[in-house]
């Protein structure tokens, strides 16, 4: 199960990565839906939180949705992501507080695999300012996150180029107000809330997946660029939903359900103000996704995609 893929398409984190040069390609086919009631519209845009330079410019459909939106909504308010307070909260949640090293809770085989990974990725760790020995200070979930993020950076994916960062900057430049569907503290709690068994599984799978990550992650990135909802669902959700139903519900379903009333408030607001909502692609896909949940509530929902063969 590709938990790393879920991070790229679902959860934000405090990340650092080194961008690479890439050839310009056709604009990505957008994961963009328009949800309407009698007077207002909400545009839902599925983000890939780490992208490449060649993923820009975006499609004209996305540019038009941004231009027509009076405000933007993200998973976390952009101003909070950049705050030192959120970094401090992440550090406090991630640090081990009982004075024991990480290895004390790892099975010997997993500890050995982590050591081997550290040796092979020392340069990547140095780039984010985290020497290998410092990992012993943290909880397994955070080290799993570090493993995944270092590997993504080595594969050329950059959080500073993700759709969230891009549109946060564009909104600021054009004076459009921004807000969030949840707080940074809530996102940290989703990660830190994994029980010990889930944390060890997450760390182990992060290490395993890093051995063969380039091909797998490139397939997922290509699916996002192609706007292929079926390939994205298969890559990000199918195995997770089957193997870790509690974690899937915690990371995806519960958050989607919590977001629905906030999105509906935008639709119910007086006037004719449109909103662009930018969230991880996973949250918009499948029967558990925000798109189908809003459709089930009776809203008019259509996919906005000039490059798609159908409007579904």
Which positions does each model-derived feature cover?
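Bacterial N-terminal signal peptides that target proteins for export
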Residues: 1-10
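Bacterial N-terminal signal peptides
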Residues: 9-18
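Short hydrophobic "helix-edge" motifs at membrane interfaces and signal-peptide entry regions
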Residues: 9-10, 36-38, 269-271
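Boundary at the C-terminal end of the N-terminal hydrophobic targeting segment
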Residues: 20-25
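Short secondary-structure boundary/capping elements
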Residues: 27, 54, 255-259
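Structured, acidic catalytic/metal-binding patches in enzyme active sites
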Residues: 29-247, 251
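A cross-kingdom marker for long, charged
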Residues: 245-312
């Amino acid at each position: 199960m590709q938990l790393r893929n879920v991070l790229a398409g679902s959860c934000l984190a405090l990340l650092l990565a080194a961008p690479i040069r890439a050839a310009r390609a056709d604009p990505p086919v957008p994961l963009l839906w328009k949800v309407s009631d009698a007077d207002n519209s909400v545009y839902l845009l599925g983000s890939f939180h780490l992208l490449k330079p060649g993923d820009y410019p975006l499609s004209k459909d996305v540019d038009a949705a941004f231009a027509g939106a009076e405000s933007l909504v993200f998973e976390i308010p952009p101003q909070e992501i950049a705050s030192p307070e959120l970094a401090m909260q992440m550090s406090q949640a991630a640090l081990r507080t009982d004075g024991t090293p990480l290895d004390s809770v790892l099975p010997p085989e997993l500890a050995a695999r982590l050591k081997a990974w550290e040796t092979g990725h020392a340069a990547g760790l140095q780039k984010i300012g985290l020497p290998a020995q410092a990992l012993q200070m943290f909880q397994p979930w955070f080290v799993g996150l570090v493993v995944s993020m270092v590997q993504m950076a080595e594969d050329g994916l950059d959080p500073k180029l993700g759709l969230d960062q891009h549109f946060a900057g564009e909104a600021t430049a054009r004076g459009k107000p921004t807000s969030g569907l949840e707080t940074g503290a809530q996102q940290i709690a989703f990660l830190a809330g994994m029980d010990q068994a889930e944390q060890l599984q997450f760390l182990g799978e992060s290490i395993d997946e890093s051995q063969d990550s380039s091909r797998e992650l490139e397939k997922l990135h290509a699916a996002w660029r192609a706007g292929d909802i079926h390939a994205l669902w298969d890559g990000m959700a199918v195995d997770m939903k089957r193997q870790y139903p509690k974690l899937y519900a915690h990371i995806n379903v519960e958050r989607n359900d919590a977001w629905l009333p906030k999105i509906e408030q935008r639709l119910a607001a007086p006037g004719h103000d449109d909103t662009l909502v930018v969230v991880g692609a996973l949250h918009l896909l499948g029967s558990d996704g925000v798109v189908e949940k809003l459709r089930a509530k009776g809203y008019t929902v259509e996919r906005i995609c000039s490059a798609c063969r159908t409007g579904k």
